[in-house]
Regions:
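Bacterial N-terminal signal peptides
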Residues: 10-20
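The conserved beta1-alpha1 loop
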Residues: 212-216, 277-278, 307
Length: 424
């Protein structure tokens, strides 16, 4: 699932000369574009027909007038939009697509941000411009400078970069290893095609406990298949966080927290279990802290980390120093990085039960101390993580096989199924 052994190979042999230069060239170009990109966020309010699709239209001011940049079909389970834009001047328009034709005929409920107001994005703008709410009106005429009708071709229809509640099968092609690699080496392309997504395997059932699975570097939700197949389908409903693992880990955690908070507001679930593998454990812990201390929610009741590098990976320091272009998440994975220190600056909330699973079968001793083939055991068993763990379980598996090993899966299922307060 995680393929972190590829990362290890990249960070070895004379300062990352294993990789082809084109990979770093692509990464460098994406990092340059990301540096100048900003995110617009807001909510579409006062929907007349809640079951109808809502289309967000992004206009950009040009010398020739207003031009449609793209359209975004909003996720009805969340009701908010998060769109990425370059430097420029933009206007936001939304409408209810009552007849599902990707067109506004002038009669469907619609609205603009402001009167409308321009959203000016410059190099000095913050990374996120929030609060750009749009209120729909059943009879509002368009301002004179805007067209009286709007028609979007399918190819112009983008999507919100943060999406929650979509139903997907784990065998869906978007969960292939190619997409996992894209999320690591070409995170901006991944955001355009997939976004930050929280997938369901089935429609939400208030009678079942959601179990949120968080993959690691280069991973996809498909890697959880063997574990999910062992869960009690009458008691649990699996959710899967799918994110660009090359981005800074705090951004991935923030996007996850935003989605969980919105889904909690919409669906009202009372409990959430979190299971994370490898680097995903760091993302998950940061999410849990944000969810409890910033969003003030107490829904996360159980957290299980699997083979997580709690003190990072020391070879990433070599990558940060020597690579022609640095994967942003490498900075966070440097041992004792500011991000890692922030993870343990606050304790997990008292209402969260934490169990630590680690793997110890590996033979990468020329470059690493005792390891599971990818991550050093000393990082998996960092004392800061051990101190907060209720129980610690070790398995004779390597970094990837722990997700398919029978004993590890059986123990994980027991932990998830045990009554509250149980020693297991």
């Amino acid at each position: 699932m995680v393929r972190m052994n590829r990362i290890v190979q990249v960070l070895l042999l004379g300062g990352l000369v294993v990789l082809q230069g084109c990979m770093f060239t692509t990464l460098r170009n994406e990092l340059r574009e990301m540096k100048h990109a900003r995110v617009l966020t807001g909510r579409v309010l006062d929907q007349v027909r809640p079951e109808a699709n809502v289309v967000l239209v992004l206009y950009r001011q040009s010398p020739d007038g207003l031009k449609i940049v793209n359209g975004t079909l909003l996720d009805s389970a969340v009701g908010k939009f998060v769109v990425k834009v370059p430097i420029g001047t933009f206007y936001l328009f939304a409408f209810e697509d009552l007849d599902n034709d990707l067109a506004w005929d002038g009669t469907e409920p619609n609205g603009y941000y402001g009167m409308p107001d321009a959203v000016v994005v410059t190099d000095s703008s913050p990374a996120t411009l929030s609060g750009l709410d749009i209120r729909l009106n059943a009879s509002a005429p368009p301002p004179g400078v805007f067209p009286e009708t709007v028609s979007l071709p399918v190819e112009a229809l983008g999507s919100s970069i943060v999406r929650a509640g979509q139903i997907a099968d784990l065998d869906d092609p978007i969960f292939s290893l190619d997409y996992g690699n894209m999320g690591y080496w070409r995170p901006l392309t991944f955001i355009r095609e997939i976004g930050f997504s929280l997938f369901f395997r089935e429609p939400f059932d208030p009678g079942k406990i959601p179990v949120l699975f968080v993959h690691g570097a280069l991973g996809t939700p498909h890697g959880w298949k063997d574990i999910v197949d062992r869960l009690d389908p009458d008691r649990f409903q699996p959710w899967f966080y799918y994110y660009p693992s090359g981005l800074p880990l705090d951004k991935n955690a923030a996007a996850l927290n935003w989605m969980v908070a919105e889904l909690h507001r919409e669906l009202g679930f009372r409990k959430l279990h979190v299971v994370a593998h490898s680097m995903g454990g760091l993302v998950a812990r940061d999410f849990i802290l944000k969810n409890a201390y910033e969003s003030r929610l107490d829904v996360v009741r159980q957290f299980v980390s699997i083979s997580s590098p709690w003190n990072g990976h020391r070879l990433t320091a070599k990558g940060v120093r020597r690579a022609p272009a640095v994967v942003p998440s490498w900075h966070d994975m440097v041992p004792d990085s500011p991000f890692i220190r922030s993870l343990f600056a606050r304790h997990l909330p008292e209402f969260v039960t934490y169990d630590l699973l680690f793997s110890y079968r590996g033979d990468c001793r020329f470059f690493l101390e005792n390891n599971d083939g990818t991550v050093e055991i000393s990082s998996q068993l960092d004392m800061r993580a051990q101190r907060e763990a209720r129980r610690i379980y070790g398995f004779d598996e390597d970094h990837g096989s722990i997700l398919t090993g029978a004993e590890a899966i059986a123990q994980l299922v027991r932990l998830l199924s045990a009554p509250a307060g149980s020693p297991y």
